[in-house]
Amino acid sequence: MKKYIVICFLFLSFYSKASFVLLPMEAEGQKNHLKAYGITYWALEKQYKVSWLLNFRGGSFLLPDTDEVRKECQIRGVTFEVFSDSKMNAILEEISSPSQNMETVVLEKAPKIAVYTPKGKQPWDDAVTMVLTYAEIPYTEIYDEEVLSDQLILYDWLHLHHEDFTGQYGKFFGAYRNAPWYIEQKRDAENLAKRLGYNKVSEEKLAVASKIRDYVIGGGFMFAMCSATDSFDIALTAEGIDICEPMFDGDESDANYQALIDYRNSFAFKDFNLERNPMVYEFSDIDTTNDRQKGIIKMEQDYFSLMDFSAKWDPIPTMLCQNHTQLVKGFMGQTTAFASDKIKSSVLLLGENKINGEARYIHGTKGKGMFTFYGGHDPEDYQHRVGDAPTVLDLHPNSPGYRLILNNVLFPAARKKKLKT
């Protein structure tokens, strides 16, 4: 009987001292930062209580200590540490101290994720689908039919990537107008627009952009990268205006369309000038890609700094900036970064390069919802070109640039707190 009591005591003592699993997220403490987000999402799906410890050891995640959680971490190669109640309570008390720029944010549910992408695209065709697949975070692919039939309300989070909402087919005409893939994509877009009841691709894409705008205003979260950022705003500001040259839509553009642009309709950008030349691979002067092509910004100098926010007063931008480094290497895309003087004052700069006069990572609110724009195509492929092989994320499990994407994936799971900035 005494032996039985001792065994029970030891068993209970062990679990009283080991009731939390911490996924450390600092630079040296985590073998696979990206898959740690996948573990956190998985735990939310399992309805475990999960917390995000902002600014604590790189933005660590706190989960309950169960055999299932430990096993899943081991299977996915994610570093974890086990803490007793007393030790974790001391840490949480330290985090809550007014003198510490840290905060505990409760994650309530696994957000339903939609990725806006044409049918038949592979996961490596954009950085978000690639990292979601790698992190084992489930998502649903949707495209114009689903958006126009009001299916966005089924999702908490929407991602847009290598898209052109202006109807100019990515401005690839100058370099690729005779390429089979360009001809096929143009034909497919025209057929889709006709099937959905539109005379032009530009009109159909504006309708899609308007539905997405309404989704955000109604409380949705939108995350856009690469050309989906500026082309989205351009489409909204050019509503009712023909900005497409004949090779794109079969008729002349409005002669004075620049003067007709209504910047009030945009989410993030102001006072931009559109690129009228169809041979130029650029939408407007929002984008700063040309500074790299001209050699003004060299690859070895291409970095951006993440801003520092008050975790207790500004938990939203703090969540979006969680990382194990404050300096993140840059990467090019069709839209690489945003000229600082073209960004509205109501928009928060999350990551910028002041010397270059550009922001890479920005965030704002629209109605009841929020949006985040992130310039560039692939955080681990500096100059991704058409036809390049996909990035192998097993070689970049600790990528700071990809972490920023995954911050946005988990962000809608957080218990809502009012932004005070």
Write out the residue ranges for each language-model feature:
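N-terminal signal peptide c-region/cleavage motif recognized by signal peptidases
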Residues: 13-16
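Helical hinge/lid and interdomain linker segments adjacent to catalytic or ligand-binding clefts
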Residues: 21-31, 61-71, 121-229, 234-238
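Extracellular/periplasmic catalytic domains that process cell-envelope and extracellular macromolecules
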Residues: 106-109, 150-153, 215-216, 365-367
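Serine-dependent carboxylesterase/thioesterase catalytic core
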Residues: 206, 214-217, 229, 233-276, ...
